[in-house]
């Protein structure tokens, strides 16, 4: 199943994609959009263009596991995406994903403007990898 991983941000939203066999997650793009409706349109178009069957949306929980304003916003955008794209949305706890993304970028010595341009897509890839890991574990039961 092709799944898009989505790391929502105030201005930049990272998007990642996996192969049909759900083995490999890769950064796809970063969508720069400040307006919710246009963001949902752009993400829906990406889902259709890439033949996605599921959207894995990062859920920014607080470190104690509670949900604040950002998590509520993610849930609202997820509901809009589900309706606009006609695809199921699965929320993935994204605590620590940006830190992990920065770690990957440090390992590859990615710096400056290039780093800023890709960090959100790499964070989306981490979210998608978490989703894929959870799906594999559920199948193995």
Each predicted region: which residue ranges?
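Phosphate- and other anionic-substrate recognition elements at nucleic-acid/protein interfaces
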Residues: 1-4, 10-141
